[in-house]
Design a protein with these regions (language model features):
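Beta/alpha (TIM)-barrel catalytic core signal, keyed to glycine-rich beta->alpha loops juxtaposed to Asp/Glu
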Residues: 24-227, 231-235
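Surface-exposed loop and adjacent secondary-structure segments within mature catalytic domains
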Residues: 21
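Metal-dependent phosphodiesterase/phospholipase catalytic core, i.e.
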Residues: 16-18
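Short, small-residue-biased leader/transition segments that mark boundaries at the very start
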Residues: 1-2
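Phosphate/pyrophosphate-binding loops at sites that engage ATP/ADP/AMP, CoA/4′-phosphopantetheine
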Residues: 5-14
Length: 236
């Protein structure tokens, strides 16, 4: 497996705590897709071979744990079965999208990972910044959504603008910023191990961190559930 020691030197570390595989190599719904299409089938490296290569890095002390990203139940099951059958390192986490607009995780992946004790590390809790409300105020506001054409396909689906507006109004009614509501929702989920946040300014970073101490109530939980039922998972 290609893993250059100078990568660790450039990172100024002796090892990587969690080494994640960013995307499945096989045919599976990605980049805003939500339907599996067998017609797109293509060859892929068996999970056992991948784990064997990663096991060498674990044995060498270059990485400590292995995680997956953008994964589905079948793929995760293959990695867990290979680890169990061939005494290879076990996957400890999955980094998948999770937010008020994308709660796909709560179906099959939630039960699977809870029973297998696999941690969720959600990314895009702010849905590419949409849940900050900035695009409601200025549709051409600077950001990935406006600067990179086609970059945020899952957030261009029907129902997304309406859901964003509803969550922003809910936040205002409870004395929160839209960003605080979006992040506190993710922080308050019992199955979330840690959250990946992003910021382009110190002010944004401060707001992200302050969301941890934002209040969360049963009334707020119910209001979020009501909005979800109206615009159900608009950005899978």
């Amino acid at each position: 497996m290609l893993f250059r020691s100078d990568w660790l030197r450039r990172l100024q570390t002796d090892y990587i705590d969690l080494y994640q595989l960013h995307w499945p190599e096989r045919n599976t719904p990605m980049f805003g897709e939500f339907v599996y299409d067998p017609a797109k089938e293509r060859p892929f490296t068996p999970p056992r071979e991948t784990l064997e290569a990663l096991a060498e890095l674990v044995d060498e002390g270059k990485i400590r744990h292995i995680g997956l990203s953008n994964e589905w139940p079948w793929g995760l099951m293959q990695f867990l079965n290979a680890a169990r059958e061939y005494q290879l390192p076990r996957v400890v986490s999955v980094q998948n999208p999770y937010s008020l607009l994308n709660r796909t995780w709560e179906t099959a992946m939630l039960e699977f990972c809870h029973r297998e004790q696999i941690a969720l590390l959600p990314y895009s809790p702010m849905a590419f910044g949409l849940l900050s409300g900035k695009y409601l105020r200025n549709p051409q506001a600077r950001g990935r959504v406006t600067e990179f054409d086609g970059f945020a396909q899952r957030y261009s689906k029907p129902g997304v603008p309406e859901a964003v507006a509803a969550y922003a109004a809910l936040a205002e009614a409870h004395g929160l910023s839209p960003a605080q509501l979006a992040l506190k929702f993710v922080y308050s989920r019992w199955f979330v191990a840690s959250t990946i946040i992003g910021a382009t300014s110190l002010a944004q970073l401060e707001e992200n961190l302050n969301a941890w101490d934002a209040p969360w109530s049963e009334a707020l939980e119910q209001a979020v559930a009501d909005i979800r039922l109206r615009w159900f998972n608009p950005a899978p």
